[in-house]
């Protein structure tokens, strides 16, 4: 805005009635001050002066606040400022807030309007430079300037009262509504038209827009030039680029790393690059380039249909390659570089982004008219001289490296350029054919193979004339929907494919780590035990390689281990005996080795089957276990009828109660240390005539059995019978043993062994086998295997330590003690341990969860705990404990 306008504004502001000394009303202050800011006289004048092309428009400061510009500039004038006193009015603060809000809204409106005006002015300057260089200044300049002058006059006439804020050469324009020629195309048209109808109509419109600009120089060319063979190729370059500048800016634009994608984006990129070279500020030219492109795209769209007739008439008159043919094929075949495509994607033009999406989806309908136009220049190029062909090729080579493929006869270096451009192309669906080799760019035969899949939508095989239009076409719709100006990484994978690959690899690594950790855990456990055991003279062997069955955790409590697994008795004991048969030197002392071991092996298997039957609660297995009992042991069963009344009187309810709290009770086998005479037990073996066991002694053992485990009852029954009768036979012992297990299978509850553990059953043969002396302390069954051998140092395999009381007695293993009665060997008392450790495989931490459920812990109340304590104390007080062991009994 000129200085005269600023002076008139300030004079009107200071001479208003608001500044008289007689007015003290605050409402009058606000009203007169507001009216003084709206200057009706200078609106049209300042708008017309700002429309004139001036270089200072681009340098204005848009970000300064409105209030500073309105008050600060008026205060920065002459000495007239001293007459303004704004501190006495109480309404100035409220008025300042209102004006600040309204000025912000007006500033947003004026920025949009000034962007449009500056883009029109800049486009006008470009058009003038272009017309002066190509010698048709009169036609184009007159047409374009007339359109812009009419638009500027419409803006000046239809604009409302404006607020002149600062005194520079720029002006803030606040239009109430956009001009009529801008509103429908800029905002409404892209939103109304659907996508399904878009491709065909949009392609024809877009093609005529480009042809219309390129036909104007063709009409001028007919009237002025006679021999226009070389001039047509020379003129095609300026229409492609809009500025006839030398090669340095074009080489900057057509970097081999850059690929153009759309005709309109390429066209405005050229002009912006030329302006960047000529103008001083690169940043301002780039921003103006975005705004100019948005307004120029719909100004060219007005009258497409009459221009089509001019193009056809021009081609028929000349019968030669017109500039529109070359420029049409060049612009549609070129691809937008991804860096420049990001600039165009970030533009504020809604219509431009909508048009880019339409052009991208309508590449296939555009191919067919391009091929028809392409055949004409190829036929005419053959008639030209060699010098003219080379000249045209050199002109075109400075502008677009992609045009070098049209001239097959000229030795142009296109290998590096096209390959580098092709590497940055988005991935098409026929990636396997494109990646076949590096020679596919040079040889036309491989380009035929490459373009077969691209031309399927046109139902037309690729010919020699349409290599340019097919070779660098847009990507397929599957990839173009993701290609919105952003660089996809990795290049040849979709985002969904990358996510699926990442999740798949993560799942595989998790599974493999879980398997390896479980296996390494078990191996490391075995190796650790082996190292410790070998240092103490023991050896560890795996029980079996049979895979354990998966536990059913829903049907068993968390504390039950026996309920979740089954015995691998056939493999375990066969491996155990075969291993000991080859390495145990104590087996060599046995005279009859095969017979007793086979019988004892069968007997051990029957014991394990019995445990398995009690766990699984199968009636069929009960009968099988009873059938599996060895035949030589069936003779002592004749006296079972005498002992049927023993367990018939047992209190089954008491047994079930004991088994219910079996996990809390340690009955303590070591506490049952009966003070028996050693001479009586040795004399019992000396007597050869068996004596029957009395019924009263059997009843004693039966009553004791109801309050203890079955192992304890059998052991106590043996010791009672030995102490009372003095001697017994092996048949009676076997008879009592078989009687115990048959009564367990018939009358004892199946849940009796719910809380037993594996370690106790592994040591079961030690408990049920008859001992030579009742005074021998029994092995503690509740201790695990690893604790049982802790601190033992055997010199070699299968040798055992002798009890301190009997240091000179021979040594036997536990399994050989099963056959000592058959061998009739005289052995003294002693505790024997095997140096072989059998490591049974259990469930890992990932397969079996030992943590109890939270609901179980929450159900335990103080009253329930007190009841459990009283019941356990009562149960312990009712036990038959030796008098010497009473002091060791623990009560809760």
From Swiss-Prot:
GO terms for cellular component: cellular bud neck; cellular bud neck septin collar; incipient cellular bud site; protein phosphatase type 1 complex; septin ring. Keywords: Phosphoprotein. Residues 208-223, 357-371, 624-643, 707-719 have a biased composition (Basic and acidic residues). Disruption phenotype: CHS3 abnormally localized to vacuole. The modification Phosphoserine is found at residues 43, 133, 281, 364, 394, 476, 500, 503, 618, 746, 825. The keyword Flavoprotein does not apply. Residues 346-356 have a biased composition (Low complexity). It comes from the Eukaryota. Residues 224-236, 270-280, 309-335 have a biased composition (Polar residues). The modification Phosphothreonine is found at residues 410, 703. Residues 185-287, 305-387, 506-526, 618-644, 685-734 are annotated as: Disordered. GO terms for molecular function: actin binding. GO terms for biological process: actin cytoskeleton organization; chitin biosynthetic process; division septum assembly. May interact with CHS3 and seems to be an adapter (along with SKT5) to link CHS3 to septins. This is Protein BNI4. The gene is BNI4.
